[in-house]
């Protein structure tokens, strides 16, 4: 059996038998890994709370036939301690973990950029220096960029004509010019697409200057764009405390075609039964 060590973020936990858990990790060098933490549900477990969702850990594992096994854990950052007592930050962090879990689909495939995005978002949420909705939206935009789904913001998604453009269409891929604008496109306020650009590129001065209505509208566009590409909504995203936004009708139609279902009560940061 070969031993290996890496830093990781705990994405999800699942009961296994009477005392064990399967821990889903996003590691720095090996991508997503599912491993068993033996005896972790016992009060005498040496792992304690170090393998709970939101934990950033240094972990040693040995390779098993089906699942790897966790042998040592050391806490690097206890992000959860600064997140779980704030509902908005907690639900935002749940959305971060669920997004990562969905995008890192293949186990054992390195996804360093996604790992850095996840740890950066959790660190920002735990630090409480920035608005949690802005942190989440910045993460979602950058995660979509990692996946190759970033919305066009400064040029037309169809003809590449330079903007600014007044319309946005998720099926087309983002901002669209007047000539290419499909039916059903939305017309966000003039400040909304610049806000999304600022979040994507880390211009926090511009992002934090945005008004509340602009932030809410931007959140709606980001969520709709993400849902279109993932083909079903994140379970945790409806729980994030933000004003309601209307899902474009084309998204509803796509969901109906796929027979998509959503469970707004379930949380990726909880323990699967």
From Swiss-Prot:
One biological process term in Gene Ontology: DNA recombination
UniProt keyword terms in alphabetical order: DNA damage, DNA recombination, DNA repair
Domain of life: Bacteria
Cellular component GO terms, alphabetical: bacterial nucleoid
InterPro entries the UniProt entry points to: ARFGAP/RecO, DNA_rep/recomb_RecO_N, NA-bd_OB-fold, RecO, RecO_C
Keyword Mitochondrion among UniProt keywords: no
UniProt function note: Involved in DNA repair and RecF pathway recombination.
Family to which this protein belongs: Belongs to the RecO family.
PANTHER family per the UniProt record, alphabetical: DNA REPAIR PROTEIN RECO
Record's protein name: DNA repair protein RecO
Source organism: Saccharopolyspora erythraea (strain ATCC 11635 / DSM 40517 / JCM 4748 / NBRC 13426 / NCIMB 8594 / NRRL 2338)
Gene assigned in the entry: recO
């Amino acid at each position: 059996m070969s031993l290996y060590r890496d830093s990781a973020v705990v994405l999800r936990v699942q009961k296994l038998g009477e005392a064990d858990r399967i821990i889903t990790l996003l590691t720095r060098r090996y991508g997503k890994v599912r491993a068993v933490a033996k005896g972790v549900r016992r009060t005498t477990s040496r792992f304690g709370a170090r393998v709970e969702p939101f934990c950033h850990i240094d972990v040693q594992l040995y390779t098993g036939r089906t699942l790897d096994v966790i042998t040592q854990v050391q806490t690097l950052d206890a992000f959860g301690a600064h997140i779980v007592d704030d509902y908005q930050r907690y639900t935002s962090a749940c959305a971060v973990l669920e997004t990562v879990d969905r995008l890192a689909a293949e186990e054992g495939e390195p996804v360093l950029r996604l790992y850095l995005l996840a740890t950066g978002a959790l660190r920002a949420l735990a630090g409480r220096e920035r608005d949690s909705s802005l942190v989440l939206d910045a993460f979602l935009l950058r995660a979509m960029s990692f996946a190759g789904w970033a919305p066009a913001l400064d040029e037309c998604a169809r003809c590449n004509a330079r903007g600014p453009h007044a319309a946005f269409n998720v099926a087309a891929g983002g901002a669209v010019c007047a000539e290419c604008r499909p039916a059903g496109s939305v017309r966000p306020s003039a400040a909304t697409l610049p806000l999304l650009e600022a979040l994507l590129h880390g211009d926090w001065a511009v992002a934090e200057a945005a008004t509340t209505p602009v932030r809410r509208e931007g959140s709606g566009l980001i969520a709709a764009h993400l849902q279109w590409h993932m083909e079903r909504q994140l379970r945790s995203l409806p729980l994030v405390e933000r004003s309601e936004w209307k899902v474009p009708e084309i998204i509803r139609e796509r969901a109906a075609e796929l027979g998509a279902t959503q469970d707004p009560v379930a949380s990726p940061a909880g323990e699967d039964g």
